[in-house]
Amino acid sequence: MLNRVQILMKTANNYETIEILRNYLRLYIILARNEEGRGILIYDDNIDSIMSMMNITRLEVIGLTTHCTKLRSSPPIPMSRLFMDEIDHESYYSPKTSDYPLIDIIRKRSHEQGDIALALEQYGIENTDSISEINEWLSSKGLACYRFVKFNDYRKQMYRKFSRCTIVDSMIIGHIGHHYIWIKNLETYTRPEIDVLPFDIKYISRDELWARISSSLDQTHIKTIAVSVYGAITDNGPMPYMISTYPGNTFVNFNSVKNLILNFLDWIKDIMTSTRTIILVGYMSNLFDIPLLTVYWPNNCGWKIYNNTLISSDGARVIWMDAYKFSCGLSLQDYCYHWGSKPESRPFDLIKKSDAKRNSKSLVKESMASLKSLYEAFETQSGALEVLMSPCRMFSFSRIEDMFLTSVINRVSENTGMGMYYPTNDIPSLFIESSICLDYIIVNNQESNKYRIKSVLDIISSKQYPAGRPNYVKNGTKGKLYIALCKVTVPTNDHIPVVYHDDDNTTTFITVLTSVDIETAIRAGYSIVELGALQWDDNIPELKHGLLDSIKMIYDLNAVTTNNLLEQLIENINFNNSSIISLFYTFAISYCRAFIYSIMETIDPVYISQFSYKELYVSSSYKDINESMSQMVKL
């Protein structure tokens, strides 16, 4: 089986071969090395990411294992509480989602009944979800005529003498709990259908949940240490045997991985006496170091490991940065060379445990030299980029694209006096993330050619992006940028499915869309009802000149890095949900998707196989390559 996987990896340059590889990855993790000997763990969830970073046909497959793990993700953002908006109808009043809907009803009734309003002003009322307690309060204030009566009881003729009583329809709604509707007119009332929504847009628009990007960039320097984890092959899969740091110690243990990790953590704790956060700098660490340590992470050690972050029981944090994501695809030695340090080879990963044990002294020496080179290169690069991209600091970002684009957006927006804001709370962050679709939308299954947008950068740099804090609006204003919670109805006739939904049997569903995606969907025949939106009154002007100025500055510093960065930006604009410019990514991806749809409009739908926001699969039998298609590159 290993031979079969090795052959597949060498020829993994087409869709069919990669799909066969995926089948193996459902059962095994592939142990591989790159040309510098850096270990790489390939599993089903990260193969796409790895293929975007490197040519996997050049990797050396060492083995297969089931004794490993994926990165342990941070605890998921809790789902926001489901929400029902307030409905004030002539026949009834339904309060918005609340822990105390009865209190909301009595306050609403006080708008019409001055004696209730006076009692509330003079005495107040404690929150309660008990009808009997509300009635007790009303009676004590001489307002028993407004007592609350359940609709079912009223229909039993028990309370007809109380003509002014407050009749409420009681119900239990899934994922929300008890809810009450005040029935104003018994003759015309019928229980309404109330939309249960995933977000409260009014809440999300609150000023305190948004902050100016520039305010988050002014951070003091945090201590940085270069680190590398080395693993050997055993009968039970890969095993970490050495953790090297610079400046710092090297930890080696062939008998107990637990003790190896505990010694490393004790050392980390000792050097954190004057700071609550430090940065560990690795190279391709997300592909080997971190997942390998995660497999063996000891319980009850005082630290939890989540993705690239270590969090101690007392709140201290260690952030594991991957310098490779700032290298624009350079090998470790090329990265060190281009940033002025002496390139040193590093020990090979995934060697036999016996070989590692026999050569441990030379491996320690080789590791220290390599880490010293990485540390010096990283310090030089971070210093240079922080000058060019001020006030952005390298350790605040997970990849160079984020840092570069944040710098450009901040510079352009500040120069025009309009800053871009970002959400500081999980719920608005989740709302923005929900508006992004990176999935492929399947149209027809057929043999196809793959096309990609020639330059994502050209498309997104000429567009507008939100500036300032958002405002809540019930419906977005044409010509303004907004993100709306929408009820979407699929066209009844044959259509290209431009709005992603994971249930093909549903013709109406609720989702989050940008104003750009709404325009695209309406062009495609969808019916869109907006259920509330975040709208921005101001826009950041086009970014093209700011992008070109920044590219030139970096090019003067390091031409190789700039050329590679420009290539990455042209080909990709991938959403990063931890980015403070998530709003930019949201609209950038929508603009790309609108561009893809404009091309699909020129093609007979029978020839379209699938598409994403930047790629389009067209039937191999399609020959009419029109002018629109010339803006795509065939892969």
Swiss-Prot record:
- What GO terms in the biological process aspect are recorded for it? microtubule-dependent intracellular transport of viral material towards cell periphery
List the record's Gene Ontology CC terms alphabetically: host cell; host cell endosome; membrane; virion membrane
* SUPFAM superfamilies, sorted: Ribonuclease H-like
**Species per Swiss-Prot/TrEMBL record:** Vaccinia virus (strain Western Reserve) (VACV)
The entry describes its oligomerization and partners as: Interacts with protein OPG164/A36. Interacts with protein OPG064/E2.
| Location(s), subcellular | Virion membrane; Host endosome
Keyword Membrane included in the entry's annotation: yes
Q: Keywords assigned by UniProt?
A: Early protein, Host endosome, Host-virus interaction, Membrane, Microtubular outwards viral transport, Viral release from host cell, Virion, Virulence
Gene this protein is translated from: OPG056
> For this UniProt entry, what is the primary localization, expressed as one broad class?
virion
* Protein family according to the UniProt entry: Belongs to the orthopoxvirus OPG056 family.
Function recorded in the entry:
Plays a role in intracellular enveloped virus (IEV) transport to the cell surface through microtubule transport. Together with protein OPG064/E2, forms a complex that interacts with host KLC2 (kinesin light chain isoform 2) to engage the kinesin-1 complex and thereby promote IEV trafficking.
Q: Name one Pfam family in it.
A: Pox_F12L
**What is the recorded name of this protein?**
Protein OPG056
Q: Which InterPro entries match?
A: Poxvirus_F12L (IPR005005), RNaseH-like_sf (IPR012337)
Induction remark: Expressed in the early phase of the viral replicative cycle.
